[in-house]
């Protein structure tokens, strides 16, 4: 934790000097630090939207990348039995992926309505796929059209609209920060397949700089980096331009995916990414991303039970923040430009909870312990950052055979927040003696009391009935306790 405080303090110090110049190497780039707003904002919306939103299909296989609908083109090309059988039966064996482009119309796209949903969700920033691995761009990219030899962006293609620009304006008008996911590689780009060095210097570099210069993102979520090292991608050179000469030198935040050798490293310049994972080291700035279902892109094959409940999503956010991270929660819009209503409903439910309890989330830090466990054997928790099969809702579910999470904790300055998953007549924080005995439930005017009992601090909840709680989970604020 001391390391994280140092990183944030160092970040503030570096931004005091406008004369800082960064060389094209990680030693220099890591001196830049990460803008403090990112770690404070905690919650963002991820959007996967592209040509894959037309077939919008993947088999539903939990904890497997095979469930990613946005990988449709790659899967049918590699002959995946699930994707290939679906494609051949619905579209025909000779139907080419490029033929989905005229079907990507976005005719019902209303960026203001999207932005309103995001605002109401309580998210503080939004990250849109400017370009996924298929190479199709949501803004007017001349490099895309030139190197694909066809209209391969939303402006010159069928939508005839700057989808990225329109959403960017609406999101910023709603008071949120806007960022972009950008794939370094493109599966079947002719230039990528024939001359990777030329692809980097003549396609990627000018395209990336065009995106940044025109739209000025607050976040860049790079991906598709694993095919080559950071040296082969010339990533340090590109990031030196971003930090020194771009229009977003002070504000932009970047992830750790800039070469097959960069994930989890360079924590001075990049935040660490986890994908359907079990979380990261709380001493670094990290972000967990996952969908509401098993896919990032919209998957029509998912059923109601494949979507996380609103309560499970709220617990996911609480859990990630309690462990010192950010949550980037993904939605997959349909090809017609609408956000599936069930996804909207989940986001609004999260926002309703945050309206009452946001004090325990935004601007907080991880406490010395993220959880308090019940008595019993703790379930084994794998630490993978990819497809870990991890569920905060399951960890917090009372059971007889193993221990479960009774409470989650966050802190802000001298205040401790105890987040309780379900009503309990008594909250007992083990081994804790607060510096002051001032307790209240967020969103409630009911008086509750706390007392010391040996080494434990007990909060009496008996003055409240379960239906008198404003929200579940509920939050007990222990003011000046630390």
Region locations from a protein language model:
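Mature catalytic domains of secreted/periplasmic carbohydrate-active enzymes
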Residues: 20-482
